[in-house]
Regions:
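Bacterial N-terminal signal peptides that target proteins for export
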Residues: 1-16
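Formylglycine-dependent sulfatase
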Residues: 28-432, 436-466, 470-477
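Bacterial N-terminal signal peptides
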Residues: 12-26
Length: 477
């Protein structure tokens, strides 16, 4: 019998190995839904039509809410940006993973992120928009901490499981994101400039997965600039028939808000600040509509789970800023309802029944356990996870949460259950107790009327805080 040359045997074995790897990836990915997490920046609970706003036009988000499940009590894990974002990808409270407030800490390599976990299940992963979980460059002065001043906080998306990214460290203007008009130092808004010669660099860059600064196609509406990168990522995955996990974290309507002429004209009867605030939200809404239309055109809408929320409540004082938390008390940076209760939707035509609303409290930390449950992956068991799977809720089989949600931010504390909320302002000695079902505006303190309930909830909160402190000390790894 004639034997094959060694090189032929080696090549044959190599191709067999490739076939095995490809087959394994296909097997892991078979039947698994695509997943997209959409988040706005500083969008208030009352800033959308589906929560009753009569001024700001959000027809695409309203249609998404009508086509899916709307959360009346969806919470950001923190009243500011970075901590909430980290909760989305870890399922953990910010104090556990070391980003307790905005522009503090970074995503540690020891943390398990959704992108890392989903890659093991055959997903391609992409991040588009605001990152805010670490610096994106070690060499160039960028944004709040980028460059030599923030080397210890270098933790870009590609170091946390993302195959592709088009990301900023932090905020940018919502129109011409890399530019600021010369001579204009406003922190709130300005009119769009038509000529780049009239502008100077804003100071925050977009970076890709190769660590390169990206400047092409960055003029005009920032939400469109972001979606221009997210859609090709989705198209490529759909062509390969590979499940995708995409994060689309818009900058709008974080200050400075700048809308283009078409969108400010929609709100011509309002003050300039409001025109830009409302306009950039409508521009963002159009990009959500564009994404939903693209999923339908690609034939993958029924196989794609779309989550939508905001990272915290609206910026500024209620009597001087255009954003609104509607009837809720408090705003950004507060653990009162208006600071952490945010718009929330999930749409999945293939599984989630349309036109449903839930009053069950849910939180951004629920994303990770929910997604792992949806794809039938093993839950994380080697460290505390604060979120819970919402799959029973998506399927219409959950009557109540039964697992309170804990909050801590700069001295403020809150413990929120299905009905009651325990709250303590930073520096205060006593807790307040609110019945959120009867009193969502938190006007009536029940702590003195129901001391036993307040004590029981306070004990639960302290036990949870003790667990978070163990995690913060690095003992989970």
């Amino acid at each position: 019998m004639t034997s094959l040359p060694p090189i032929v045997v080696g090549v044959s074995r190599f191709f067999c190995f490739l076939l095995f790897v490809v087959g394994l990836a296909d097997g892991l990915a078979a039947g698994k839904p695509n997943i997209v997490l959409i988040m706005c920046d500083d969008l208030g609970w009352g800033d959308v039509g589906f929560n009753g706003n009569k001024i700001i036009r959000t027809p695409h988000l309203d249609a998404m809410a009508k086509a899916g499940l709307k959360f009346n009590r969806f919470y950001a894990a923190a009243p500011v940006c970075s901590p909430t974002r980290g909760s989305c990808v870890t399922g953990r409270h910010p104090y556990r993973y070391g980003i307790p407030f905005a522009n503090s800490g970074h995503m540690k390599p020891e943390e398990l992120t959704l992108a890392e976990l989903l890659k093991k299940q055959g997903y391609t992963t992409g991040h588009f928009g605001k990152w805010h979980l670490g610096t994106l460059t070690k060499t160039v002065k960028d944004s709040n901490r980028g460059g030599l001043r923030g080397v210890k906080h270098f933790s870009p998306p590609q170091a946390n499981g993302f195959d592709f990214c088009f990301s900023t460290e932090s905020k940018v203007p919502t129109w011409d994101p890399l530019l600021r008009p010369k001579g204009n130092n406003s922190k709130k808004w300005w009119d769009a400039v038509s000529n780049a010669g009239e502008a100077k660099p804003y100071g925050t860059a977009y970076w890709n997965e190769r660590g390169e600064s990206v400047t092409e196609n960055t003029r005009g509406d920032d939400s469109r600039v972001i979606m221009d990168r997210a859609i090709p990522f989705i198209r490529g995955a759909a062509r390969r028939e590979q499940p995708f996990f995409g994060i689309v974290w818009f900058h709008a309507p974080h200050l400075p808000v700048v809308a283009g002429p078409r969108h400010t004209a929609m709100y011509a009867g309002h003050p300039n600040y409001a025109q830009h605030y409302y306009g950039c939200i409508t521009a963002l809404d159009e990009q959500v509509g564009r994404l939903r239309a693209e999923l339908r055109a690609l034939g993958v809408a029924d196989d794609t789970v779309l989550f939508f929320c905001s990272d915290n409540g609206p910026e500024g004082q209620a009597d001087s800023a255009p954003g609104t938390a509607a009837h809720l008390s408090g705003r950004k940076r507060s653990l009162l309802e208006g600071g952490i209760r945010v718009p929330g939707i999930v749409e999945w035509p293939g599984r989630v029944k349309a036109d449903r609303t839930t009053d069950i409290p849910c939180v951004t930390s629920d994303y990770l356990p929910t997604i792992l449950d949806l794809i039938e992956a093993k839950p994380i068991s080697d460290r505390p996870i604060d979120g819970m799977s919402l799959v029973p809720l998506l399927d219409g089989k959950l009557a109540k949460r039964d697992r309170p949600i804990g909050f801590e931010s700069k001295g403020q504390l809150a413990w929120i259950g299905d009905r009651y909320k325990l709250y303590r302002k930073g520096g205060a000695a006593e807790f307040k107790l609110f019945d959120l079902v009867a009193d969502p505006s938190e006007k009536n303190d029940l702590a003195k009327a129901q001391p036993r309930l307040a004590k029981r909830l306070a004990d639960q909160l302290e036990a949870w805080r003790a667990s978070c402190q163990v995690s913060a000390a690095g003992k989970d790894y």
